[in-house]
Amino acid sequence: VVSDTLTLDEDCSYSVYVEDVNRNFSSARVNLYLDVTKYNVELTDGMPAATSKTFLCLETGRTFYVANIANDPKGIDLGFTYYEGNDNKACLVSLDEYYKTGNYAMVVNDLNPEVIFKDATDLVMFDEVDKASDLKDIFDQAKDYPTVLDYTAGKIAPALEEEDMIAFRTEDGRYGVMKVKEIDRKNEDTSNNQTISLDVVVEKN
C-alpha cells in the first residue's frame, strides 16, 4: 500500500519495491510526467553595442526564438522589440507580424508561425501553474492587449513591465504563460546590453 502523495514540479522516475505474502521482493519502475514544461530564457541583443533590436536566445542561437532545447525543442517563435521612437516600452511581437516594428524591412510572410498574446497580469501566480488545463483557463480569462500601430489584435504584448504575466497560444495550439522576470531597458545605463528574462510554462508537444 502506497500512502504518499507526490506534488511534482518536474518529470520524475522512481523505483518501487513490492513485498508479497511470502516475503518475495520485486521492483517496478514508475515514470511520472507533467503535461507542461517550465524554464527560464534570456533574450539578448545580438550586437556588441546593443543596437540591432534583434533579440535571440543564447541557449539555441536562434533569432526570435524562446526555447529550452531539452524540454521544449519546438519552441515559441516571437520577437522582442521596443515601441518605435520610445526606448522604454518593451514589447513581445508575433513573428508573423514582426516586420511591422519598422526595425527590419522584412517581407510579409504568412508562413512564419503566429503567437497570440493576452494580458494575464494579476490573474495568476506563475508558481501556481502546473498543468495544461490551467494554461487554457488562464488564456480564456486573460484580457486582450490594446492593439498598437497596425498590428492584428493579439499579435503584440506592449509596454511590458517586470512581473507582468503574458498568456499565449502558439500556432500549433499549445497554451502557455510567460512571466517577465527582468528587463534591462535601452539607455538605462552606459553598459546596457538590452536583455529580457522570461520565466516560461508551456504545454508539452
Residue ranges of model-derived segments:
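Surface-exposed, beta-sheet-biased, low-hydrophobicity segments with strongly acidic/polar composition
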Residues: 1, 5-205
